[in-house]
Amino acid sequence: HFQEFLEKEAHLSEDSRNSEAVRLMFEDAGDLITWMRHFPYFYETERQILVHAGIAEWGGKDWLCVTSEELMVGKRTVSRGAFYKDVIAGHISTAKISGNRIYDGIWHDGQSHYYLDGTTWRSGKIPVLEYDSETGKYREI
């Protein structure tokens, strides 16, 4: 279905493209998606918050109290700057964030934010961020 989607992609509006991608995903991986729906919307470690789209950072250390599930999966604005934990998210294309339409890697704001959405459906690459717990450093692999 991936090739079928790529062939249609150029002729579809963004909303139609998203709808078509969702339809094909359910057709190919419906059982997997149903299983994944039972997972929590975020994962938190001592140093990181991993979330699909983002959190309400204005809540500071109480971010979870003020962040809706809808925001965790649908946030469309990019957060930048220092936060008390690293926020690792996807959802927003790193090409869009970087201002480089062909960029497909991990984008880091130089402080607390890492964005991983490398537009895999187009690039064929899955950006992977590795964290070394001994050094506290990240690297793209």
Question: What label would you give each PLM region?
Answer:
Residues 129-131:
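Hydrophobic/aromatic beta-strand positions that recur at structurally equivalent sites within the blades
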Residues 2-125, 134, 139:
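Acidic, His/Gly-enriched loop-helix segments that form or flank divalent-metal centers
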